[in-house]
Each structure stands twice: as structure tokens, then as C-alpha cells.
């Protein structure tokens, strides 16, 4: 029987084949009661805070800024080949061992400090916050020497794959012929892995500044020729496998310290429609009225990180991971851990002065009768950073079931390759040919070796490699983070208490009644 419906939409039918379901690692990874502690050495880095110092094309002093990311790629030992593991703990024919991250502490050395960055030729004209007069026609060059204290950011991202960043870059227009010289190009959001040494956001946004600011005068020196990245947390937290971020901690802090405007012709001027955005200037006013040349609306703020205090520190404290945010509950596939750090709360730049006619290694040779002159000294700038990484890992087992192997093969085929599963090779189809004198000119060129080498998927990227293959220990009580873990989990032995001797009076035995 026909009936009337108020809406006529599409009819959605279920798929003909079942949709693949992403398994959580808790469904096929079995935990053990075996834990290990791992710790890196003290990791130090020194460089120039604003740019690389080059000599003949070679970098003599690298750029080391507090506004850079530090991405540590920690290499873990293969638990299936680990000598400290009891062979009776698992069956190598039906199981494989993996590491699970349960605790981490990122140590940072040095005092807190508020740094300064800027540009000696910054495109700034006038004060638009509290102006005392209206600016007249601009000169050809209005650039000033301006410095700021950058936005204060602390960021920690932990995963078994590199963190993904995002920034705004140039985009190809649909019609290149329609884009004339001097016109604003289209822009697009671009993703890339965050590498060690990449610049972060310091209050001017995440963008490709060398391409988007061709005047080289709109941002400080340390990002004027760099790409500022920001972690794409929306994308990483929605990843079906959750390998890029097990967990993250983030704290941002800033306020607008000054309000200025940029100089230069406006590419898209305010529409000249009286009564909409403004009213026309009265022509009967004196000719020297500066408002006949309307000012620039390219407003911008200079950020400030404000107060820096140790009570808001994300580092130098342990993090215990009970549940990751994704389906991967902190299983370190590939025996790797990526730790991404951004921390400019220790933004101290050392200013080093060296007298020109004195050995730099013997500065005390300056005579006490010397009369100061600034021209007698060379000034240098250096930035230093200090890190230490500590981990607590739990040993886990993965069964070599067919459905689990199929799931891992879809997720990352390199996992099965690293496990070196002994598949039965097919029977030979026939007799093969083997030549002697392979390097002879009379013999054909031999075929290349078919056995593929282990290819590093991140060989094109720059990370701070930390080798922890020989840093594991099962004696957790010998390390600070290990003792904290034992105390948190209740595995630490209780304090031995002495027995107290109490004087007691013996009671007389009661006589038994006799009938």
C-alpha cells in the first residue's frame, strides 16, 4: 500500500562485506610482571640562538634556540633477543615479546629564564594602542630595531612514531594566469613530521615565513627564514592506530604586550564607500590634515610570555601511563619511542664578550689599568640546553595467531619483518643456472640480490638519536624513577619494623574441677 512521507532522502544500506575493525592492543597483548628501567645520558647541545654560523658553506656553529623542537628517537633493545629475559617466560614458537611504556620522566637542567628575540629591521610603524597623534605619509623605510619575549610554551608528546605538525604554506591556484604580480596567493594547510630543530610557534602563528613574508621584516630573526610548526593534535588523536601520540601534555601562555601596525601599500584597501567603514575627511579642513592619507590597518601584536614560574613546569616530574588515548595502549612497535619536546621556559642566551687582542682562553690578561671602549670587544651569543630521559617499560607477549598477524600486517608490515617469522618457502619450480667468474667480461652481469635491506622509514628526517639498547636494567630500586614506580604500584618492600618487648604477667593455671 502506498503512503506519503514528508522527507525523501537517500536510503543507506549496510556494506556487502563487514567493515574491518581496528583491534585495541589490550585485546591481543598479554602483560607480564617483568619491568625494566632505562635512562639516557645527560644530553647537551650548544649553538647560536638565531641562525647557523657558516664558513665556506660549512656550518661551524649550529642554530640552537629555545624556540626549537627537540625530537628524541629512542632505540630500544629487541626483547626477543634480550639476554636479561628468562627464556621460560614465553614460547618463541607461538609468541613474540614487545615493550610497553608505563612511565616516563623528561628531565631539564638549568634555571628558568625569559629570553628575547627580535629583528634589527622590523616592519613596524607607529603605536596603535594609545596613539598621541595621527601618523602622516609613510617614509620609504620605516623599519625599526624591535625585540620581544616570545610566547611561553611547554609541550610533551610521546609515541612510537614521529609527531605530525601542521603549518600554512603557498598553494597552487586553479588558474595561474589569473594571479598577477603583486597579488595575494592562495594558501593551504600542510602536514609534515616534526623534526629535531624545527621552529615552533612563538606568537606569530604556524606558517612558512620565507614564502609568505617576502619582505623579511615581519617576524623575529629566528623564524624569518624558517617554518614554524604546531602539532596537529586533531589529526594525531583521531588516528585509528594511535601510534603518533600515546599521550601529550601542553601549556601555553601569552598576552599582547604592544599593538603596532605594518608599513607599506595595502594590497586590499578599505572599500571607499562612505558611511560603511568610515566617513570622508572634510576637504575644508587645513591641507596639512594627516587623515587625508588614511593609515594602515595591518595591525599586529607583539606577544609576551609573561611570568615564568617553576610551579607551572611540565618537566622534571614522572608521568605514569595507565591508558593511552588511542587503540595502541603504549606498545612500542619497532622497538622505538619518539619523545617530542618544546620548552622555552629556560630561554637563557649567554652573551660572551672577548677582547680582540687577548687570548680567548686567558681573559684575565686584561690589564687592570685598561680604559673601557666598546670597540675593543667582540660580542657573541650562545644558547645551551640540557636534557635527560628516563623510562619504565613492561614486558608483554603477543600470540602468533592468524587473525592477529593479519591485523599487524595491515597496520605495519615492518613489525612482522622485524620478528623474522620463518615462513615455509615454496618448492623450487625447476633447475636454476649458476655462473662462474661473475666479474668476467665474458659473463653476463649477475642479477641483483633479491634480499631487500632493512630500510629506515625515517632516514630522510632529522631526529636526536638516543641509543638505549644497553641502558636497560631490571633493578628498579637502584634508580630514582624506578623507586617512584615501585612505590606507586605498591611493589616496594615495607619498612622493617623492630619488635617491641612488652612485659607480661603470667596468669596462674586454673585447677580442673574433679567430680
Curated annotation (Swiss-Prot):
GO annotations of cellular component type: host cell nucleus; T=7 icosahedral viral capsid
Main subcellular localisation: virion
Compartmental location: Virion; Host nucleus
Alphabetically ordered keywords of this record: Capsid protein, Disulfide bond, Host nucleus, Host-virus interaction, Late protein, T=7 icosahedral capsid protein, Viral attachment to host cell, Viral penetration into host cytoplasm, Virion, Virus endocytosis by host, Virus entry into host cell
GO annotation, biological process: endocytosis involved in viral entry into host cell; virion attachment to host cell
A GO term, aspect molecular function: structural molecule activity
UniProt KW ATP-binding keyword: no
HAMAP family the UniProt entry points to: PPV_L1 (MF_04002)
Family: Belongs to the papillomaviridae L1 protein family.
Oligomeric form and interacting partners: Self-assembles into homopentamers. The capsid has an icosahedral symmetry and consists of 72 capsomers, with each capsomer being a pentamer of L1. Interacts with the minor capsid protein L2; this interaction is necessary for viral genome encapsidation. Interacts with protein E2; this interaction enhances E2-dependent replication and transcription activation.
Its job: Forms an icosahedral capsid with a T=7 symmetry and a 50 nm diameter. The capsid is composed of 72 pentamers linked to each other by disulfide bonds and associated with L2 proteins. Binds to heparan sulfate proteoglycans on cell surface of basal layer keratinocytes to provide initial virion attachment. This binding mediates a conformational change in the virus capsid that facilitates efficient infection. The virion enters the host cell via endocytosis. During virus trafficking, L1 protein dissociates from the viral DNA and the genomic DNA is released to the host nucleus.
Protein name: Major capsid protein L1
Lineage: Viruses, Monodnaviria, Shotokuvirae, Cossaviricota, Papovaviricetes
